């Protein structure tokens, strides 16, 4: 069974754009760099050649990863999401019950997560604690710095 990878439309488009760039722009650039380095002679002590081959290996590995992710992508249409219970795609406003600090997060796929931008992975401890909860509920999250308690203030979509 192939596990689907949930993601937003925006996340899927970003993966497709990176895949296109790596295949159509980065791959030819690296091949050219390898050919140029090869022209410099002895490959055993040719740092440019070894660096280009390493870049090629990294790029091809990422292409394989992106092809797999886009093939297994389950694009979730956030415009069709609604309801009071928190699930994938929800924007959730929380208040830290100790510091009274408010935070807003959107629950997204693993590949889209960017905490600084307010996007947390569906598989993160805080997202797992939020799934199925509603406004007014409290959650407790075991974070690296200790346990944190939050109250859910708002749930929105889109």
From Swiss-Prot:
The lineage of its organism: Bacteria, Pseudomonadati, Pseudomonadota, Alphaproteobacteria, Hyphomicrobiales. Belongs to the GreA/GreB family. HAMAP family: GreA_GreB. One of its GO terms (molecular function) is DNA binding. Pfam families: GreA_GreB (PF01272), GreA_GreB_N (PF03449). The keyword Transcription applies. The keyword Transcription applies. Necessary for efficient RNA polymerase transcription elongation past template-encoded arresting sites. The arresting sites in DNA have the property of trapping a certain fraction of elongating RNA polymerases that pass through, resulting in locked ternary complexes. Cleavage of the nascent transcript by cleavage factors such as GreA or GreB allows the resumption of elongation from the new 3'terminus. GreA releases sequences of 2 to 3 nucleotides. It comes from the Bacteria. Keywords: DNA-binding, Transcription, Transcription regulation. Gene3D superfamilies: Transcription elongation factor, GreA/GreB, C-terminal domain, Transcription elongation factor, GreA/GreB, N-terminal domain. It comes from Rhizobium etli (strain CIAT 652). GO terms for biological process: DNA-templated transcription elongation; regulation of DNA-templated transcription elongation. SUPFAM superfamilies: FKBP-like, GreA transcript cleavage protein, N-terminal domain. This is Transcription elongation factor GreA.
